[in-house]
Amino acid sequence: PVEGRKMRRSSHALIEDQSDLDTDCHTASELFEAFADNKEWDVISFAHCGGRYADITKAHDGRFEKSVEVHSAWGTFEWIVHDAFKNGYRVGIIGNSDGHKGRPGASYPGAGWFGAIGGLTCFLMPDLSRNSLVECINTRHHYATTGGPSGRMRLEVSMSFDEPATQYLDDPLLAKNCTTKPCSQAMMGDIV
């Protein structure tokens, strides 16, 4: 990812500097359009839920949004995964705290009505670097848990093929010239 890009906000409420109002993106669709217009293909974006139903079909763009949030301090949202798969989206699944306190997996519930302990995401990365994290997100090599004391687990899912298979390095429904490679094995998140 490139540093120093324009900050795009959904609002300038409570922000004194109003000099960049023209970069505001009031909807997710506007945000994805701005990314595409500026050829910012390496951004990371997740569909986040604040405890209430959100229709992922209104703004999902698989070029930028590689995962959806299934759990946070606001509850568990399995419906977003069902909606994504029903619509043919190839997404990974993440869990977050949404606690804003820097306590992954140990945040307080978001609200009494639909609150829960914050979730966790396990990223299956070869090393702890920004590039590995971005690659892990883009290839959906991650999974979510509901957090808490029992939510810290390591899970690996893989398969082997009896015959040669083809792995797509991106969603072939989104990329016109999607790069492929032959494979005899695949892991969680791979598109074969």
Model-derived segments and their meaning:
Residues P1-S72, P104, G110-F114:
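Surface-exposed loop and adjacent secondary-structure segments within mature catalytic domains
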Residues H26-T27, G75-T76, F85:
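Short, glycine/acidic-rich beta->alpha junctions
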Residues C49-A59, F64-K66, E78-V192:
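C-terminal functional module detector
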